[in-house]
């Protein structure tokens, strides 16, 4: 059996310009994007690559990969596609003391992705074919804008996205005027989504949804704080529009079901 000989994190830093948006960590402007690439080496010379979330915490994620994940995986057999879930479950169980979300899961996810890449390389097929048969040859992409805050600038960025060929827009705005500005800029036929990043309580989220109803958003994503308030997340859609809680709640499939 092919064995894992090492798991190593590589930090990649890319200069970044947010343009008209205010892309900050606290009061500090973010001018670089940090990516943590996870390399899984084997005794057969085949290497798998993954991506561990390192947004503003690349050192922490990389350290978790090198000092928590690598010792757990080193020396184990390389799983095939069917064996990856059980392999990753073992890793999660061994490291559950360090948290079921946050840095630990960021590092674990990088290993998970790398194992899928490795499994495809061993089979000699593209990863998409290993996962399953293709249902379509083209996938539509939407423009996911940063939080901008000013209606006029939001409208301008939406128009720029359309000129670049995007056929749907996702905002990260939390005020009704900015959402209306986007809808006016893109017209009635373009899908519009709003990702809010958990700023409101249930009453505020419901009021915001009603205020934006005329813009016909496909969904409001992460409107409620705290993101694990499942009861409120279930209540707001009954009084407003569709809510998509998404990534801040997900640990495998448990919270998705909730």
Name these PLM-found stretches.
Residues 162-165, 213:
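Non-catalytic positions within long, well-ordered alpha-helices that form the structural scaffold/packing
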Residues 6-7, 41-122:
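Metal- or metallocofactor-binding catalytic centers and their adjacent structured scaffolds
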Residues 1-48, 53:
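Structured beta-strand/loop patches that form or line metal/cofactor-binding pockets in enzymes
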Residues 138-153, 195-202, 245:
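Active-site mouth loops of central-metabolism enzymes
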Residues 171, 176-258:
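Catalytic core of soluble alpha/beta enzymes
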Residues 125, 147-154, 160-162:
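Active-site beta->alpha loop and helix N-cap motifs at the rims of alpha/beta catalytic domains
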Residues 98, 123-147, 181-183, 187-189:
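N-terminal small/glycine-rich loop or linker at the start of catalytic domains
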């Amino acid at each position: 059996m092919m064995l894992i000989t090492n798991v190593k994190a590589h930090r990649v830093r890319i200069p970044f310009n947010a343009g008209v948006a205010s892309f900050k960590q606290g009061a500090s402007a973010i001018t670089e994007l940090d990516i943590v690439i996870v390399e899984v080496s084997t005794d057969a010379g085949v290497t798998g690559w993954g991506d561990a979330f390192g947004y503003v915490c690349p050192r922490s994620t990389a350290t978790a990969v090198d000092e928590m994940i690598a010792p757990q995986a080193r020396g184990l057999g390389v799983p095939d596609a069917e064996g990856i879930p059980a392999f990753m479950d073992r890793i999660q169980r061994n490291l559950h003391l360090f948290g079921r979300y946050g840095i630990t899961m960021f590092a674990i996810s990088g290993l998970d992705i790398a194992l899928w890449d490795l499994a495809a390389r061993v089979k000699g097929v593209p990863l998409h074919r290993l996962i399953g048969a293709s249902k379509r040859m083209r996938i539509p992409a939407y423009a996911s804008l940063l939080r901008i805050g000013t209606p006029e600038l939001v409208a301008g960025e939406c128009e720029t996205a359309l000129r670049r060929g995007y056929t749907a827009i996702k905002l990260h705005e939390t005020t009704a005027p900015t959402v209306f500005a986007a809808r006016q800029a893109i017209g009635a036929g373009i899908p519009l989504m709003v990702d809010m990043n958990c700023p409101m309580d249930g009453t505020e989220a419901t009021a915001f949804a009603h205020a934006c109803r005329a813009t016909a958003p496909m969904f409001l994503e992460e409107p409620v704080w705290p993101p694990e308030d499942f009861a409120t997340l279930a209540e707001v859609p009954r009084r407003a529009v569709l809510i998509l809680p998404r990534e801040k709640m997900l640990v495998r499939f448990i919270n998705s079901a909730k």
